[in-house]
Amino acid sequence: MMSSKPQKRRGKPAEKGQQRRKQRNSDAGGQTVKHQSSQRGGRQDVAPNAEKRTRQAEPQWIAMKEGARPAERLPRILESVSADGFHLIDSGHGLKLEQYGNYRIVRPEAQALWPPLLDDKVWQSADAIFTGDTDEDGMGRWRFPHAALGETWPLEIMGIDFLGRFTSFRHVGIFPEQIAHWQWMRDVLKANEQKKRGEPLKVLNLFGYTGVASLVAAAAGAAVTHVDASKKAIGWARENQALSGLGDKPVRWICEDAMKFIEREERRGNHYDIILTDPPKFGRGPNGEVWHLFEHLPRMLDLCRSILKPDALGLVLTAYSIRASFYSVHELMMETMRGFGGIVESGELVIREGGEDGKTPGRALSTSLYARWVPA
């Protein structure tokens, strides 16, 4: 399943922002390269009216469960800062300037409503600029102001080697705000090694994209099942597994609709210690299955609960590009886990600016909502 394209920004940026955009998008000294589409599993951009053209799905409501609601911690802001090969340098006027390995990249960011903090010359040092417009059906273009770059380049985060890639949908192969979840998962897996009883802990990664989270889990000793509806994303994830030297780790790469997969796992009686789920607002599976987050999320979480082990270690939901408060996903998770015990913690994932050196804390850029169930 893949996602809807980003919402089109409204309103005009400040004059300085307009000048900066014109300067960055000019053809002078730059080279425009349009690469093959690289889908983001769980979040592929689609045509602007694709969601409207699709028949509205019927909501899949769940029944009230018996038992007490879990305890709760909220709001909890999970902050990702500089991590190995990534940091957010600056943001503002609808853009963000990021460092990915050796490359500086400028991409649109609708949440960056404030003025940029750093001088124009810092922004002009960018190696790659995404210049696509939402009117282009998501098939955006990258401009390389200083030298033509290849489609891929090596990255390392949390000890995992993988490929960054300039995709036609502006994504680059990793969503760094997820680092906060990955660090939590790695620590939980390490702290619970005694639970293995001769077998590795089991992690299910739904809408797994390029597999970085799956490889973090595998490196921490887990047996991982990675599910994504995009063949391209699965292929990219396999490349990353080979590049990271984790080819001997137990990772199952499954190209399938996430809902169909977890329905089958429930029928088979398979269970997991940790489940990560990062669904899109709208998307399609490999066989044309249609996903609408607001209609299908309740049942998806309910199925996830049904395939958690009784002594499970966590269920994580991240939600992007939706018009909702984190309270919406929080209360859904609370009711989903009613009678299961534990604690639900919810809030936002943010990335903190780090300046040019990655060590100078700046503004916090909100990226998504999340709800996470953990045992008490």
Give, region by region, the residue ranges found by the protein language model:
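Conserved SAM-binding motif I beta-strand of class I
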Residues: 223-228
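S-adenosylmethionine
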Residues: 258-339
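Conserved SAM-binding loop of SAM-dependent methyltransferases across substrates and taxa
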Residues: 210-222
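Conserved class I S-adenosyl-L-methionine
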Residues: 197-209
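S-adenosyl-L-methionine
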Residues: 230-276
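Non-catalytic accessory regions of SAM-dependent methyltransferases
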Residues: 1-111, 122
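Non-catalytic substrate-recognition/targeting regions of SAM-dependent transferases
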Residues: 78-99, 105-176, 183
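C-terminal catalytic and target-recognition region of SAM-dependent MTase-like enzymes
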Residues: 312-376
